Amino acid sequence: MDLIESIRALAALAFTLGLIGLAAWALRKYGPDSIGRAIAARQDRRLKVIESLALDPTRRLVVVSLDGEERLVLLGDGRLLDWTPKGPPPASALSPSPVAEPEPVV
């Protein structure tokens, strides 16, 4: 291998490493996170994930905001397991049912 071929091989190696470094820099600067933020900033989205909590490897609690209302959703095994309904809970869940007064016996 003479001197010219060695210089050519080193130049090709430097060029390849430079391209890899350029790709890493571009992914950091313009990667999926920044693209997602740019799209979200351009659009007023109706559905937003506020917070997510992994309960175990298969189940996850997610707080989502839909049209300004927050809902709690339980996800697991690739399907919806439970969700909080719209509106306040029924009155029976808040207070015990009224007990009928006993009638006097004559």
From Swiss-Prot:
- Taxonomic source organism: Caulobacter vibrioides (strain ATCC 19089 / CIP 103742 / CB 15) (Caulobacter crescentus)
One GO biological-process annotation of the entry reads: archaeal or bacterial-type flagellum-dependent cell motility
Q: Tell where it localizes.
A: Cell membrane; Bacterial flagellum basal body
Q: How does it sit in the membrane?
A: Single-pass membrane protein
Q: Which family does it belong to?
A: Belongs to the FliO/MopB family.
One GO location term (cellular component): plasma membrane
The main location is membrane
Q: Where is this region: Disordered?
A: 84-106
Q: Which UniProt keywords apply?
A: Bacterial flagellum, Cell membrane, Chemotaxis, Flagellar rotation, Membrane, Transmembrane, Transmembrane helix
For this protein, the parts annotated as crossing the membrane are 9-27
Top-level lineage group: Bacteria
Name of a matching Pfam family: FliO
PANTHER family (UniProt xref):
FLAGELLAR PROTEIN FLIO (PTHR38766:SF1)
Identify the taxonomic lineage of the organism of origin: Bacteria, Pseudomonadati, Pseudomonadota, Alphaproteobacteria, Caulobacterales
Which InterPro entries did the record assign? Flagellar_biosynth_FliO (IPR022781), FliO/MopB (IPR052205)
What name goes with this protein?
Uncharacterized protein CC_0952
